[in-house]
Amino acid sequence: MRAPDFWYTPPQAPALLARLLQPFGKIYGMATARRLAKGTPVKLDVPVICVGNLNAGGTGKTPTVIAVLTTLMDMLETPHVVTRGYGGSLKGPVRVDPSKHTAKQVGDEPLLLAAFAEVWVARDRAAGCAAAAQGGASVVVLDDGFQNPSVHKDFSLIVVDAEKGFGNGRCLPAGPLREPVDIGLKRADALLSVGAAEAQARFDSSTLPTDLPHIRGALTPLQTGMDWSDMRAIAFAGIAHPEKFFATLRALGANVVHSEPLDDHQPLSTALMSRLEADAKRQNAQLVTTEKDAARLPNSFRTKVITLPVRLSFDGQENALADLLRPVVKS
């Protein structure tokens, strides 16, 4: 499912459907608040760093987790990731093994993250964090889980798409929010907005807590030596905002002769891939997708599709993430 357009109308001028759904949004927000108030969070013997969001859907969270992992490893830490494994069938806790697990079992994001660090899939986040700590983690990176009260977080980093912001400011299903912005940011330790300079400038003009550390980053294509200029490409993406992936390809100079937006985490069936392959042959084009989608490719198509990896960069704030995390792991 892709986010509906009415989620991202201006808060001061919400769409009719957002206004009609507003009572349900209030109920959702209250349900989140009640869930957060329940029970006592489990505190581990190792720090837990949560990378979460207030919005449903893509905010740049996965590249942020990768950036957090590399930053922690630069500090000589041994981070393990704990994630729910959205789209996978295994309940866990289970340590992800890319040599034997598939996206159908553990989800696409865990397979992608497993290239950088040990990853645990667990529907029960507390059990997953405990397994990671027992498995040798010196610090646990909780992928999502900001609205999960079962685990004590030593540091919570909220990620937001600078272009989309917090949408129309309403909770699901009236808007994209899992909880009201003001309530969520009060529990956060820092905010990371992801986007180009123009989007960052617009986001900066919105009302944010002045005492909350705010760092800015952008998703930039990883330099792999691939010459994208004038490449005829058929691009497909099953992520929250596939249009951003297509725009990135065009910005690199690729001639995107066809773009196929898919639902977030949509299974890449053999029938779908065979159709795209036939289109590519007919138009003398190359199939291109995202790293996350590549994790869901049928084995027979893995050598036929090129991926465009992106990483989080911090222009002028290269040490900002390390400065935030160092006190957490060195305390």
Swiss-Prot record:
It catalyses: a lipid A disaccharide + ATP = a lipid IVA + ADP + H(+). Pathway: Glycolipid biosynthesis; lipid IV(A) biosynthesis; lipid IV(A) from (3R)-3-hydroxytetradecanoyl-[acyl-carrier-protein] and UDP-N-acetyl-alpha-D-glucosamine: step 6/6. ATP binds at N55, A56, G57, G58, T59, G60, K61, T62. One of its GO terms (cellular component) is plasma membrane. Its EC number is 2.7.1.130. The keyword Ribonucleoprotein does not apply. GO terms for biological process: lipid A biosynthetic process; lipopolysaccharide core region biosynthetic process. Disulfide bonds: none annotated. Coiled coil: none annotated. InterPro entries: LpxK (IPR003758). Keywords: ATP-binding, Kinase, Lipid A biosynthesis, Lipid biosynthesis, Lipid metabolism, Nucleotide-binding, Transferase. GO terms for molecular function: ATP binding; tetraacyldisaccharide 4'-kinase activity. Transfers the gamma-phosphate of ATP to the 4'-position of a tetraacyldisaccharide 1-phosphate intermediate (termed DS-1-P) to form tetraacyldisaccharide 1,4'-bis-phosphate (lipid IVA). Belongs to the LpxK family. This is Tetraacyldisaccharide 4'-kinase. It comes from Roseobacter denitrificans (strain ATCC 33942 / OCh 114) (Erythrobacter sp. (strain OCh 114)). The gene is lpxK.
